[in-house]
Amino acid sequence: MKITFYGVRGSIPTPGKDTSRYGGNTPCLVLESEDNQKLILDAGTGLRLASKEFKQYQAPIHLLLSHHHWDHIQGFPFFDPIFEAKRQLVIYPGHTTEAHDTAI
């Protein structure tokens, strides 16, 4: 299994020279199995960088949201594959309530 960290920061992204060594994006990881299946964990600002990894990937994209705090979802609007009409995206929400389920 391969794990790529695209973002590990807290509440807000912090780009700049002071964070270039460890990165400044909010949470986003991509897990890739030995048979090339991919799972995205969280949709923080690192998801924008992960978009490049999914350009040639034609299988359904699976996104697991650990929870719905802003720093774990704020990269979603910048994830290029969501704008591709034929792209299949499966989203697994974190812990939800009935109100969350209705909103989603």
Question: Model-derived features: where do they sit?
Answer:
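Binuclear metal-dependent hydrolase catalytic cores
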Residues: 1-104
